[in-house]
């Protein structure tokens, strides 16, 4: 967990590579195996990167605190009109409050960048966040 906190502090760095940052969170996660898939380009807007890294950190933390999961997956995809983050686990329903503070923070972060987030509780727990792409002239931060 300390390395997860360190990764979040490193978010101040503008050259954060989304794939590497989330891969690091996943590799440091020892509660259960996590399958990580990344299918997004290297030109992801800075605010999208920060949102997805923060949500990934909170979701992995929630798996430890609220789940008896034996496996999880974390997928980041880029579609023609949006960026998508999906995190799911196969844990039992021991979550007491689907509207907890951590989930509220995730929702706030996604909504600040014009996106949506949904939580599903069938067959484990799933988080699906989508953030629409902006016009080409909007500021982006590439991972060089």
Indicate residue ranges for each PLM-predicted region.
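Flexible helix-coil linker/loop segments in the cytosolic histidine kinase module
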Residues: 3-17, 39
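A short, flexible helix-to-loop-to-beta junction within the catalytic ATP-binding CA
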Residues: 12, 64-72, 95, 121
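Helix-loop-beta hinge of the Bergerat
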Residues: 16-51, 56, 60, 64
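Conserved transmitter core of two-component histidine kinases
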Residues: 32-39, 84-86, 117-120
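Short beta-strand/loop element within the Bergerat-fold HATPase_c
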Residues: 71-81, 88
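ATP phosphate-binding glycine-rich loop and adjacent ATP-lid/helix-beta elements
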Residues: 96-128
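C-terminal beta-strand of the catalytic ATP-binding
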Residues: 129-135
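C-terminal end segment of the histidine kinase catalytic
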Residues: 135-144
């Amino acid at each position: 967990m300390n390395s997860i906190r360190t990764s979040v502090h490193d978010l101040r760095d503008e050259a954060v590579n989304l794939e590497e940052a989330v891969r690091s969170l996943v590799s440091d996660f020892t509660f259960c195996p996590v399958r990580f898939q990344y299918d997004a380009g290297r030109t992801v807007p800075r605010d999208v990167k920060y949102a997805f890294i923060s949500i990934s950190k909170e979701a992995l933390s929630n798996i430890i605190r609220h789940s008896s999961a034996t496996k999880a997956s974390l997928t980041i995809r880029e579609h023609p009109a949006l960026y998508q983050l999906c995190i799911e686990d196969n844990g039992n329903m021991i979550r007491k409050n689907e509207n907890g503070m951590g989930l509220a923070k995730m929702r706030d972060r996604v909504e600040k960048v014009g996106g949506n987030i949904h939580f599903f509780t069938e067959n484990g727990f799933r988080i699906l966040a989508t953030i629409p792409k902006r016009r080409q002239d909007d500021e982006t931060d590439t991972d060089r």
